[in-house]
From Swiss-Prot:
Its EC number is 2.7.7.72. The keyword Transferase applies. InterPro entries: Bact_CCA-adding_enz_type3_sf, CCA-adding_enz_C, CCA-adding_enz_firmicutes, NT_sf, PolA_pol_head_dom, PolyA_RNA-bd. Keywords: ATP-binding, Magnesium, Metal-binding, Nucleotide-binding, Nucleotidyltransferase, RNA repair, RNA-binding, Transferase, tRNA processing. Pfam families: PolyA_pol, PolyA_pol_RNAbd, tRNA_NucTran2_2. Its cofactor is Mg(2+). CTP binds at G27, R30, R111, D154, R157, R160, R163. This is CCA-adding enzyme. The keyword Cell membrane does not apply. Mg(2+) binds at D40, D42. The lineage of its organism: Bacteria, Bacillati, Bacillota, Bacilli, Bacillales. HAMAP family: CCA_bact_type3 (MF_01263). A single active site specifically recognizes both ATP and CTP and is responsible for their addition. Catalyzes the addition and repair of the essential 3'-terminal CCA sequence in tRNAs without using a nucleic acid template. Adds these three nucleotides in the order of C, C, and A to the tRNA nucleotide-73, using CTP and ATP as substrates and producing inorganic pyrophosphate. tRNA 3'-terminal CCA addition is required both for tRNA processing and repair. Also involved in tRNA surveillance by mediating tandem CCA addition to generate a CCACCA at the 3' terminus of unstable tRNAs. While stable tRNAs receive only 3'-terminal CCA, unstable tRNAs are marked with CCACCA and rapidly degraded.
Length: 400
């Protein structure tokens, strides 16, 4: 049994010693079978939340009404959830009623996808009532039971299914795909914030191209903000988003590949409810994709935008990242004599004193001239040198 599980075994032991069932469940069990890195460890039990709290010294109530208590053990936190059934879903996303039960099988049958609906006992034996193991072997994504019922319960499960397809490279079961196309309108009941989380994970998946094609074939894209079919060109579908780093790079690539101008890009990202900072960064990165770089452009962009937009340019044209080119760009940026206007040896106040003039738009214009001269190494970034240069410029204008 893998290390993350062995660390949590004392929790199962405690529950067993007091007469309760306890199993590892969910994504961690799936990832064991896939040979992937194990993430969070979740535990399911027939002990009620109150009982779980009484058995462990350190717990956190994160949703007792839905059966979940966090148990803190040896510096780690584990979600311990009581076996339950759910009925009468509201808004196609949350159960109206939750009933605690004593059957592991019934608890597993309420879950979304077969690959997520397996359990593992304390000895490492897999309990699979839904064919999850077989679906992993066949590389297939399908719901537990009737897909229409699962999507009626929580419409976001449609996007989750395609997100797992993107991450794992599996195929979508035919009946699951058919139900998606039929019930796609239910996604209108899901908040943009929840859809955004799934979309970001989908875009970062190794098999994103396959997932985007499924979004199109099932017409799910019609229920997502700002995605119009005529903009979903091959370049958008085939771009390797998973090779990018931050979400600002991912969204920057998206708006560039959708062919949105800056005004439309801002509206598109606002529809997706991006934070102000993430939106601003994504738009800036997109602005400089395919840029012909010089000192002024590097100064305007800044190091992060420079490297991020260059990465997107490389991936767009070559589908790979050239790290030597990125390193060369970083060296060029580091060699700039100034990185911000504040680095200039003169300020607006200095210019006002030197010119003996009051404030006005002339200050910004003159600072811009000085900035360009310094960036192109035509002028040393020293106050005295700048004042001499400005005097020489004045004399030239007079002579002209």
């Amino acid at each position: 049994m893998n290390e993350p599980f062995t660390h949590a075994i004392p929790i199962l032991h405690t529950l067993h010693e007091h007469g309760y069932q306890a199993y590892f469940v969910g994504g961690a069990v799936r990832d064991v079978l896939l040979g992937r890195e194990i993430g969070d460890i979740d535990i399911a039990t027939d002990a009620t939340p109150d009982t779980v709290e009484s058995l462990f010294e350190k717990t956190v109530d994160v949703g007792k009404e839905h059966g979940t208590v966090i148990v803190l053990h040896d510096g780690m936190s584990y979600e311990v959830t009581t076996f339950r059934t759910e009925s009468e879903y509201e808004d196609f996303r949350r159960p109206k009623e939750v009933a605690f039960i004593t059957s592991l099988k019934e608890d597993l049958l309420r879950r979304d996808l077969t690959i997520n609906a397996m359990a593992m006992d304390i000895n490492g034996e897999i309990i699979d009532h839904v064919g999850g193991k077989q679906d992993i072997e066949r590389k297939r994504i399908q719901t537990v039971g009737d897909p229409a019922c699962r999507f009626q319960e929580d419409a976001l499960r449609m996007m989750r299914a395609i997100r797992f397809l993107s991450q794992l490279g599996f195929e979508l079961a035919a009946e699951t795909a058919e139900a998606m196309e039929k019930d796609k309108h239910l996604l209108a009941n899901i908040s943009v914030e929840r859809k955004k989380i799934e979309m970001e994970k989908l875009l970062k998946g190794r098999y994103c191209e396959r997932a985007i094609k499924v979004l199109i074939s099932t017409k799910l894209y019609e229920e997502l903000p700002g995605l119009e079919k005529d903009r979903l060109q091959d370049s958008f579908q085939t771009f390797p988003y998973y090779l990018l780093d931050g979400l600002e790079e991912v969204w920057g690539a998206v708006i560039h590949l959708l062919g949105l101008d800056e005004e439309k890009a801002v509206l598109f990202l606002k529809e997706w409810k991006l934070s102000t900072k993430l939106l601003k960064d994504a738009v800036a990165i997109s602005r400089y994709v395919d840029c012909e770089w010089n000192a002024e452009k590097m100064f305007e962009a800044g190091e992060h935008v420079l490297l991020s937009s260059l990465k997107i340019t490389q991936l767009k044209h070559e589908r790979r990242i050239f790290f030597d080119e990125l390193e060369a760009a970083k060296s060029s940026y580091d060699a700039l004599p100034i990185k911000t206007l504040q680095d200039l040896a003169v300020s607006g106040k200095d210019l006002m004193a030197f010119r003996q003039k009051t404030s006005g738009k002339w200050i910004a214009e003159e600072l811009d001239l000085v900035k360009k001269a310094v960036l192109h190494n035509h002028l040393e970034n020293r106050k005295e040198a700048i004042e001499e240069w400005l005097t020489a410029c004045d004399q030239q204008l007079e002579n002209d």
